[in-house]
UniProtKB/Swiss-Prot annotation:
One of its GO terms (cellular component) is cytosolic large ribosomal subunit. Keywords: Ribonucleoprotein, Ribosomal protein, RNA-binding, rRNA-binding, tRNA-binding. The gene is rplP. Part of the 50S ribosomal subunit. Gene3D superfamilies: Ribosomal protein L10e/L16 (3.90.1170.10). Belongs to the universal ribosomal protein uL16 family. The lineage of its organism: Bacteria, Pseudomonadati, Chlamydiota, Chlamydiia, Chlamydiales. InterPro entries: Ribosomal_uL16, Ribosomal_uL16_bact-type, Ribosomal_uL16_CS, Ribosomal_uL16_dom, Ribosomal_uL16_sf. This is Large ribosomal subunit protein uL16. Binds 23S rRNA and is also seen to make contacts with the A and possibly P site tRNAs.
Length: 138
């Protein structure tokens, strides 16, 4: 699973979700992509499940790019623990996504294959997404 090798601080605050995605809003590497329509957290397990779903559907054809990285730690306190006594230990890693963010890109496959593969991957996520094509930018 994806996680940072080293971070400056082990624990992070929850943060804010307001606004649209600042970067990665266009398909830059492949021909087709999956773009978010909602904001939320995507865990490293969800990213891995999407990657496996895309690769299994495309088999050896095409190339896949993952455009998100889980760089935020989420903490959790043990079960049946009373409130207080500090923040819990880091439990898993998430990527913060806002509307407009490209999550995955694929290339060297037909539009139908890319659409099916990305639809299967979208089923693994807890947020709404859409299929987008590459547009030429000046």
């Amino acid at each position: 699973m994806l996680m940072p090798k080293r971070t400056k601080f082990r624990k992070q605050q929850k943060g804010q979700f307001a606004g649209l995605s600042k970067g990665a809003t266009f398909v830059d590497f492949g021909e087709f992509g999956m773009q978010t329509l909602e904001r939320g957290w995507i865990t490293s397990r969800q990213i891995e499940a999407c990657r496996v779903a895309i690769n299994r559907y495309l088999k050896r054809k095409g190339k896949v790019w993952i455009r998100v990285f889980p760089d935020k730690s989420v903490t959790k306190k043990p079960a049946e623990t009373r409130m207080g006594k500090g923040k819990g230990a880091p439990d898993h890693w998430v990527a913060v996504v806002r509307p407009g963010r490209i999550l995955f890109e694929v290339a060297n496959v037909s539009k139908e294959d890319a659409q099916d593969a990305l639809r299967r991957a979208a089923a693994k996520l807890g947020i709404r997404t859409r299929f987008v094509k590459r547009v030429e930018r000046v």
